[in-house]
Swiss-Prot record:
InterPro entries: CFI (IPR044164), Chalcone_isomerase (IPR016087), Chalcone_isomerase_3-sand (IPR016088), Chalcone_isomerase_bundle_sf (IPR016089), Chalcone_isomerase_sf (IPR036298)
UniProt pathway: Secondary metabolite biosynthesis; flavonoid biosynthesis
Top-level enzyme category: isomerase
Lineage top rank: taxon: Eukaryota
Catalytic activity: a chalcone = a flavanone
Function: Catalyzes the intramolecular cyclization of bicyclic chalcones into tricyclic (S)-flavanones. Responsible for the isomerization of 4,2',4',6'-tetrahydroxychalcone (also termed chalcone) into naringenin.
The keyword Lyase is assigned to this record: no
Key word Isomerase present: yes
More info: Part of the biosynthetic pathway for all classes of flavonoids, a large class of secondary plant metabolites, many of which are brightly colored.
EC number(s) recorded for this UniProt protein: 5.5.1.6
Protein encoded by which gene: CHI
Protein name: Chalcone--flavanone isomerase
Length: 223
């Protein structure tokens, strides 16, 4: 595997990412596009807190394959490649498992700061986005992170962000809450793999895996 998180020296089950899963909400087949570690800079020190796996609906191959056939080095430096993943008309699922304890309020504050910074930079931080980010922050605080082993965000093509959590490694069947704002939903994934990504490892893995997975005949659901 290309991602360091997929061949950790002391692997744990919660840090493993299946190649293909079924969305418990839509029942769509979704495949693992890439996985990596995410951290935050706190008081000048970068600390790893979570493992992230990004899953894409199987129809992503038609949306991405014909346009992105470049080499790893080219894709790594091409922001439009990641933006096409973020804005693509297909379901996305972000699965996160913890490496290090981090309180719900501290985690949500850092994530929201990154989301707001992106929304302001692209000029989409209006009243609706302010409300959506505030709601997202409140919901994140409710899901106190040190009590949760796995968290999941589901992003639908029409802009719905579904939030759920689990105390074991299973993917939750029901969502705890939803945020209906496309800009805010996209901003969550943007902070992970966009221009100022908090998970360079995840970006590298996406650039390495997706071209091979999306080549005609290479990726088939059920294989």
């Amino acid at each position: 595997m290309c991602c360091s998180i997929l061949h950790h020296r002391n692997p744990r089950r919660e840090h493993e990412f299946p190649a293909v899963v079924t969305s418990p909400v839509t029942e769509n087949h979704i495949f693992l596009g890439g996985a990596g570690e995410r951290g935050l800079t706190i008081n000048g020190t970068f600390i790893k807190f979570t493992c992230i796996g990004v899953y894409l609906e199987d129809k992503a191959d038609k949306s991405l394959a014909t346009k992105w056939e470049g080499k790893l080095e080219e894709l790594l430096e091409t922001l439009d490649f990641y933006r096409d993943i973020i804005s693509g008309p297909f379901e996305k699922l972000i699965r996160r498992s913890k490496i290090k304890e981090l309180s719900g309020p501290e985690y949500s504050r850092k994530v929201m700061e990154n989301c707001v910074a992106h929304l302001k930079s692209v000029g989409t931080y209006g009243d609706a986005e302010v409300e959506a980010i505030q709601n997202l922050q409140k919901l994140s605080r409710m899901l106190i992170f040190h009590l949760v082993l796995l968290k999941k965000n589901r992003q639908s093509p029409d802009g719905i962000l579904g939030l759920s959590s689990s105390k074991d490694i299973s993917i939750p069947e029901k969502e705890d809450a939803i945020i209906e704002n496309k800009a805010a939903s996209s901003a969550v994934l943007e902070t992970m793999i966009g221009e100022h990504a908090v998970s360079p490892d995840l970006k590298r893995c996406l650039a390495a895996r997706l071209p091979a997975l999306l080549n005609e005949g290479t990726f088939k659901i059920g294989n």
